[in-house]
């Protein structure tokens, strides 16, 4: 069961994670001086943690960007990496970035006053994209990508890259994520924030010890949306649990160990980032998500999970109609949102096969 929990947090397939063929990432810290956020607040220093796999070639044209998802680190795409997978590090240079608010990149928990804890500014998906654009262009001297691949909040970033920088990448892949957080998704996130902040220990974010009751309530509420209803009915959690594991034990594991060590303000910060995502609010589109999607120029592989409760396939189907060069390929899985991160062998194969084929075109 703990392997499954870790898999869902990091999106590191336990099958890929144990493979000797993975070229494990080298970790770096990129510092942006006086980083101005969309809200107008300026951080004297903003840190972006990232990892790299493989080597940048002399032409500097073999780079692939892998932006992280909710509370994940730079290891979140190892299910795609290695011999026999879609991303071969003997040929490609992979850059895996970490979102603001994950506890490693600049976050409420690791930033000094006056921006510590609940005073840390809300960071939008565009803030994250702009920071990574500076990393690529100014620090790594990469002005063009071979591909960009994102899962969940990484998919949100993929959509924003496609709109903000329509010529920056040859191809883009989005799995289990949409171009906008629609009202139902916003309500879900607010429910999870409410569960977390109801703990009196939370104290409006100025807590002196972790709000354990709130964190446990958050874990249970989040878990209810993670998989499909049929996944639970068929008890597919047994495929990754020790023999004899009970349903009560599964729930308790999610309640007490969902994101070990996570800071409550960090969790909330990234939920606010998620809530505000909308490519239609990019400058020049006046809030029109359809117009923003129509502006996407490059081939776009759109892979929603057929049973995702976070990003329903109906939302993805609606959006796909406005992307000129879309390949719409739903993942036929019962694993809900997690299907987009290869949470089981069948989904891992489906993703790798389709992404590898897309990148070869």
What are these model-derived regions, one by one?
Residues 51-114:
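N-terminal cap/lid subdomain of alpha/beta-hydrolase-fold enzymes
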Residues 17-66, 74:
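Catalytic-loop region of hydrolases
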Residues 168-170, 174-257:
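Alpha/beta-hydrolase-fold enzymes
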Residues 143-186:
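Conserved hydrolase catalytic core segment
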Residues 296, 302-304:
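Short beta-strand/loop motif that positions the catalytic acidic residue
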Residues 309-315:
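Conserved alpha/beta-hydrolase "acid-adjacent" motif
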Residues 115, 126-147:
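Conserved acidic catalytic loop of the alpha/beta-hydrolase fold
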Residues 318, 325-361:
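Catalytic active-site module of serine/aspartate enzymes centered on a nucleophile-bearing elbow/loop
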């Amino acid at each position: 069961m703990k392997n499954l929990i870790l898999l869902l947090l990091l999106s590191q397939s336990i099958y890929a994670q144990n493979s000797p063929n993975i070229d494990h990432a080298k970790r770096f810290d990129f510092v942006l001086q006086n980083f101005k956020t969309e809200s107008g607040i300026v951080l004297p220093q903003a840190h972006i943690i990232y990892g790299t796999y493989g080597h940048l070639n002399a032409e500097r044209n073999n780079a692939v960007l892998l932006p992280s998802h909710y509370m994940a680190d730079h290891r979140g795409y190892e299910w795609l990496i290695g011999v026999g997978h879609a991303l071969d590090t003997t040929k490609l240079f992979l850059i895996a970035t970490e979102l603001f608010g994950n506890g490693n990149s600049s976050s409420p928990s690791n930033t000094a006053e006056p921006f510590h804890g609940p005073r840390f500014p809300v960071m939008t998906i565009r803030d994250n994209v702009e920071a990574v654009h500076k990393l690529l262009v100014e620090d790594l001297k990469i002005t063009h990508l071979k591909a960009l691949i994102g899962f969940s909040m990484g998919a949100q970033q993929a959509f924003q890259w496609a709109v903000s920088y329509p010529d920056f990448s040859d191809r883009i892949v989005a799995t289990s994520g949409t171009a906008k957080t629609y009202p139902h998704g916003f309500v879900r996130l607010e429910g999870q924030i409410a569960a977390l902040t109801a703990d009196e220990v939370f104290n409006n974010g100025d807590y002196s010890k972790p709000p354990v009751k709130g964190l446990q309530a958050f874990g249970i509420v989040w878990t209810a949306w993670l998989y499909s209803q049929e996944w639970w009915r068929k008890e597919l959690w047994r495929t990754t649990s020790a023999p004899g594991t009970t349903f009560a034990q599964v729930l308790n594991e999610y309640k007490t160990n969902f994101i070990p060590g996570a800071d409550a303000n960090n969790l909330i910060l990234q939920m606010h980032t998620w809530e505000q995502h909308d490519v239609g609010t990019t400058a020049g589109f006046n809030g029109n998500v359809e117009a923003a999607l129509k502006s996407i120029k490059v081939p776009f592989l759109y892979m929603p999970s057929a049973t995702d409760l976070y990003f329903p396939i109906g939302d993805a189907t609606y959006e796909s109609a406005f992307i000129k060069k879309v390949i719409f390929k739903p993942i036929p899985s019962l694993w809900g949102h997690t299907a987009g991160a290869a949470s089981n062998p069948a989904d891992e194969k489906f993703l790798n096969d389709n992404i590898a084929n897309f990148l070869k075109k």
